[in-house]
UniProtKB/Swiss-Prot annotation:
Domain of life: Viruses
InterPro entries (alphabetical): DUF7570, Phage_T4_Gp55.2
Protein name (database record): Uncharacterized 12.7 kDa protein in Gp55-nrdG intergenic region
Length: 108
């Protein structure tokens, strides 16, 4: 598979996903089906040998890498920014004064 195919799919998907997200919509399987058909027809017209499943895989891969799972309407529980509480700040200041002697880490 060439970089040209990936670039064509990426440029196609970026504009579509951005417009969907601006409207407050998400990427659904039906939308992916539609995009897959359009891209596969375009690839066939340009004499590119690529299957429909591969087109869909590349679409999903690009959307996940660029927009994360939020584009599909799923909230990620893996990492979320949290505020550092005042209690934690005070505790770390006290640990620093004690040269982190109370921390439960193995020392070499």
């Amino acid at each position: 598979m060439t970089i040209q195919i990936k670039n064509a799919i990426n440029s196609y998907a970026y504009d579509k996903v951005v417009s969907l997200l601006e409207k407050g919509d998400i990427v659904t399987p039906q939308i992916l089906d539609k995009w897959e058909k359009e891209l596969h027809q375009t690839m066939k017209q340009n004499d590119q040998k690529i299957g429909r499943n591969t087109v869909r895989e590349l679409l999903v891969q690009y959307i996940l890498s660029e927009f994360d799972v939020k584009a599909f309407g799923v909230e990620s529980k893996a990492y979320q920014k949290h505020e550092i509480s005042d209690k934690t700040i005070r505790r770390m200041k006290n640990q620093r004064k004690k040269k982190f002697a109370d921390l439960k880490i193995t020392k070499v």
